[in-house]
């Protein structure tokens, strides 16, 4: 890896049981030039997949957008059970500046991904942590409160209009929270 700029990303997907789906979700991270898949782990009890990858900002952007599309296509939260709180097929997408990148660049990447996944997959997106647009959205627990089932009503409230995308929960994929932070 002789990349000039590196950002880490640790997306969490609401699938931890179906290995075929997991392989399809992770596939864009394996094949995209400029992206390195560092690790992924699934938990059957939580029904959750956590992926850790690093990459150049533009390559990371492309791989994340593709993986979100796979998750939206494969995961139906109406059929989802698990011990971990969740509000979306892709629950959270954190971006962490690692090398020759600033927090501002990570925030810009989070907004670019948010705009794109909202546009092409019709997902409502909330920005939180360092990317938050309002103080009541900085904490993930506040954003996620109500989870998938309660988000259909919550998202109608003026203070919970999404930062990007439609002001209604996606019928099967829910909502997604995207953020930038200093470290995990």
Language-model-detected regions and their locations in the chain:
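N-terminal amphipathic/basic leader segments beginning at the initiator methionine
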Residues: 2-26
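Acidic, His- and aromatic-enriched active-site or binding-groove loops in soluble protein domains
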Residues: 146-164
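A generic, well-ordered mixed alpha/beta core segment in the N-terminal half of proteins
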Residues: 62-131
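Conserved small/polar residues in nucleotide/adenosyl-binding loops
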Residues: 182-184
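N-terminal glycine-rich anion-binding loops that anchor highly charged ligand groups
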Residues: 2, 25-50
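A generic structural motif
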Residues: 13-17, 54-60, 96-103
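Short, charge-patterned binding micro-sites
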Residues: 39-56, 83-98
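Short, low-order "capping/linker" segments at domain edges
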Residues: 94-104, 108, 135-152
